[in-house]
Amino acid sequence: MALPKIEDVRNLSDADLAEKIAEAKRELFDLRFQRATRQLEKPHLFKHTKHRLAQLLTVERERQ
């Protein structure tokens, strides 16, 4: 899974952006749960998800 380009994130509508933020937060929660129970098979996904969430939140903040 490649990290998303910031240009792709900036082209999202406000509704899509909010949906993607909620999705990334849910995925991060699931990854934390898997890590705590030692079921996480791909630890790099944790970093990718945090990075994607940071991009989404940055773009949301830029629009305010």
Swiss-Prot record:
Name of the protein in question: Large ribosomal subunit protein uL29
Keyword DNA repair listed: no
Domain of life: Bacteria
Keyword annotations from UniProtKB, A to Z: Ribonucleoprotein, Ribosomal protein
Cited SUPFAM superfamilies: Ribosomal protein L29 (L29p)
GO cellular component: a single term: cytosolic large ribosomal subunit
Bilayer-spanning residue ranges: none
GO terms for biological process, alphabetical: translation
InterPro entries per the UniProt record, alphabetical: Ribosomal_protein_uL29, Ribosomal_uL29, Ribosomal_uL29_CS, Ribosomal_uL29_sf
GO molecular function: structural constituent of ribosome
Record-stated family: Belongs to the universal ribosomal protein uL29 family.
NCBIfam families cross-referenced by the UniProt entry: L29
HAMAP family given in the database record: Ribosomal_uL29
Gene3D superfamilies in the cross-refs: 1.10.287.310
Listed Pfam families: Ribosomal_L29
Statement: the UniProt record of this protein carries the keyword Ribonucleoprotein: yes
